[in-house]
From Swiss-Prot:
Its cofactor is Mg(2+). GO terms for biological process: polyphosphate biosynthetic process. Belongs to the polyphosphate kinase 1 (PPK1) family. This is Polyphosphate kinase. The gene is ppk.
Length: 739
């Protein structure tokens, strides 16, 4: 669990000006203080938005705070270091790349908070240099020593004895040397292409004959383990426990091993220097869908181009010489402002390998999801269809098992001879997806199967293309959605013959049909046989597979046409109901739980609700551009963020005065509301809305461990040190363990 005394290391003073606050030590990066902002009724000030890029970096800083929290199990802390690194990689590949493109094209479109692309890039560079250094220091000064205390060592070549060096010499010659390609640079050998996110050694070699020096590059193979484990040499003994304890693990980074054998790679030369470096390339591309008849081929062409995207970041070891850096800047065409200098190891995303060690005592207590009570097998197992005919079911993953609910729903539909058709959207799915295999089996059994596979899902394009082809080969009707839009909704429709009638069964969720991430992501889903939702999903799939453009639905809000308008309309209705009931009753309440809150129109609607006296409570995992708690326009808005063992991924919206609960796939962002097909469904069953209400109350409990957003844009750990505290996710796990 996250400690209230956050970031407990010697360097935490760099990160704070007072207890429990994270922010950059550069005051120019801070958002305007609340005192500079005021507004009268129905007026909204110009500085009402927080910068979305800075807000994202703040989110990643909260992830880093978990890594620095010494109350968490040690390998969980290493995992959060890896997550931080992967997050930052993607941020540069997409967000920074997009800002650079706009800056280079002189598209001086300002952000909602008034910054040009260049100003944002400057701010990002300063913030990133600070937080990347902090990331490295948390590893070097806190996590790495703690690993050593538990018998897990990441060592250097100089730490090894002769027996270990002999062992690694054999390993290098047999397993590593054959796959390495040293690339020298001279008039006959141009500077080599450096692939994005690859780890490399920049080497200077000297010719003994004339003393001339040449640059060479060695790529660290990405198809072998980053950390080479040495043979176990003993055990950590816990004499008080009376057992032998755990084996000692000693790892050498692969780049250290290669560096030790550079003379083997460059025989007859003197190795003058070597330094690690890594570049990040632009991976933000678009397919001109309206100009290409074959979207699949167009996407594959763009994927091939992605690896040649322009560099957007150069990470270097902090011991790199100026001359070596100047050469890399020149040859890679990188601006000095895009250089991130890192002490210690580059690319800590590789710590996933260390997390994979079989050391359960250093990880979170195991949690096994339970089967939803409605689907639990008793004396006579009942089909999911029979259960849904009795009433709707709300599943909450990972606390409820995905395999025994959503996955079983689709598998039963596949095996049921009375099922005529299955229609499903697929955005991201697992590599050995049981969902996709079930759809293939259904098609081979003669059922009508439609799969909308979103092949433009970023960084999952290749996997989705493979699945699309496998589905087509099995006879599934595969479509790629609507031109110009990504299909991000999570929907499944099963059509079943029941006597003389046809009944439709549906699933609408907030998370992907991915059995692996369903164990790690927190999501909710509605399983129902309600006729109005069945009719809505029929219309939606007809719109996705045909040329119809359905705009109004019975029980759904559908982007890109209906969600923003529908949410703002309900905010306005909540305000009206609040006024009608009398502001003193405090009836007006809007609660939102989501991944990101950025859309200016939705934010402005919430500001106006606050001005009318409606209380607004927001639980946001990542980006939040809304400035809460400011007199005159947002004093009734409260924002918090919950991070922990599971990734909080569900989207839930509640309007108390008008008594409506909505769940679905959409965050309040431009891309979700304007450039994606998203679905929000209203949950009407009082049993289910009570469950959603309980979930929101737990997340918003004053004693729940969280981060709270201040008017100046800084995030504060809450509750404060010494106060009673509860963990939202742990509370839910204990409730399910006790069943």
């Amino acid at each position: 669990m996250m400690s209230n005394d956050l970031l407990v290391t010697d360097i935490e003073a760099e990160a704070r000006t007072e207890e429990n606050i994270w922010h950059s030590d550069n005051s120019a990066l801070a958002a305007p203080p609340a005192a500079t902002t005021s507004a009268s009724q129905d007026q909204l000030p110009d500085d009402r938005y927080l910068n979305r890029e800075s807000s994202w970096l703040d989110f990643n800083a909260r992830v880093l705070a978990l890594a620095a929290d010494n109350s968490l199990p040690l390998l969980e802390r290493a995992k959060f270091l890896a997550i931080f690194a992967s997050n930052l990689d993607e941020f540069y590949m997409v967000r920074v790349a997009g800002l650079k493109r706009r800056d280079e094209m002189d598209l001086s479109v300002r952000s909602a908070d008034g910054l040009t692309p260049r100003e944002q890039l400057s701010r990002i560079g300063e913030q990133t240099q600070w937080i990347a250094s902090r990331h490295a220091r948390v590893f070097l000064d806190s996590v790495l020593p703690a690993l050593g205390e538990e018998g897990i060592y990441i060592v250097t070549w100089t730490d090894l004895d002769q027996a270990e060096r002999d062992q690694l010499s054999t390993y290098f010659n047999e397993q590593v040397f054959p796959v390495l390609t040293p690339l020298a640079v001279d008039p006959a050998h141009p500077f080599p292409f450096v692939s994005g996110l690859s780890l490399n050694l920049a080497v200077t070699v000297k010719q003994p004959e004339d003393g001339t020096q040449h640059f060479a590059r060695v790529k660290v193979p990405n198809n072998v383990d980053r950390f080479v484990e040495l043979a176990n040499r003993g055990a950590v003994r816990d004499t008080s426990a009376g057992d032998e304890g755990q084996l000692i693990h000693r790892f050498l980074p692969m780049e250290e091993l290669i560096a030790a054998f550079l003379p083997v790679l460059f025989p007859g030369t003197e190795i003058v220097e070597h330094h690690a470096f890594r570049i990040t390339r632009n991976a933000d591309f678009e397919v001109e869908e309206d100009r290409d008849e074959d979207l699949l081929q167009a996407l594959e062409r763009e994927l091939a181009r992605r690896r040649f995207g322009s560099p957007v970041r150069l990470e270097i070891a902090d011991d790199m010489t100026e001359s070596m850096l100047e050469l890399l800047l020149r040859e890679l065409d990188v601006h000095p402002s895009d250089v991130i200098e890192v002490p210690g190891l580059l690319d800590l995303s590789s710590l996933w390998q260390i997390y994979g060690l079989d050391r359960p005592a250093l990880k979170d207590r195991a949690f096994i999801p339970d089967t939803h009570p409605a689907f639990a097998e008793r004396e006579t197992p009942k089909s999911i269809f029979a259960t849904l005919r009795e009433g709707d079911v709300l599943v909450h993953h990972p606390y409820h098992s995905f395999a025994t609910s959503v996955q079983r729903f689709i598998e039963q539909a596949t095996a049921d001879p009375d099922v005529l058709a299955i229609k499903q959207t697929l955005y991201r799915t697992s590599g050995d997806s049981p969902i996709v295999l079930a759809l293939i089996e259904a098609a081979e059994a003669g059922k009508q199967v439609v799969a909308l596979v979103e092949i433009k899902a970023r960084f999952d394009e290749q996997a989705n293309i493979r699945w699309a082809r496998a589905l087509e080969h099995a006879g599934v009707h595969v479509v790629y959605g609507i031109v110009g839009l990504k299909t991000h909704c999570k929907t499944c429709l099963v059509v079943r013959r029941e006597g003389p009638t046809i009944r439709r069964y549906c699933h609408i969720g907030t998370g992907n049909y991915n059995s692996k991430t369903a164990r790690l992501y927190e999501d909710v889903g509605l399983l129902t046989a309600a006729p109005d939702i069945g009719a809505d999903l029929t219309d939606l799939f007809n719109s996705l597979t045909g040329y119809s453009r359905k705009l109004a639905y019975r029980n759904l809000l559908v982007a890109p046409y209906g969600i923003r308008r529908g949410i703002i309309e309900r905010v306005e209705r909540e305000v009206a109901a609040h006024r009608e009931s009398g502001p003193q009753t405090g009836k007006g309440l809007i609660r939102l739980k989501m991944n990101a809150l950025v859309d200016e129109q939705v934010i402005d609607a919430l500001y106006r609700a606050s001005q009318a006296g409606v209380r607004v409570e927001v639980v946001v995992r990542g980006i939040c551009a809304l400035r809460p708690g400011t007199e005159g326009f947002s004093e009734n808005i409260f924002v918090r963020s919950i991070l922990g063992r599971f990734l909080e991924h569900s989207r839930i919206i509640h309007f108390r005065a008008i008594d409506e609960f909505w769940i679905g796939s959409a965050d309040m962002m431009h891309r979700n509301l304007d450039r994606r097909v998203e679905v929000l469904a209203q949950v009407k069953d009082s049993r289910l809305t009570a469950q959603l209400d309980e979930l929101l109350k737990s997340a918003l409990d004053p004693f729940t461990r969280c981060w709270e957003l201040r008017p100046d844009g800084q995030w504060t750990a809450s509750p404060q040190k010494g106060q009673q505290v509860r963990d939202h996710q742990e509370s839910l796990m204990e409730r399910h363990r006790s069943r």
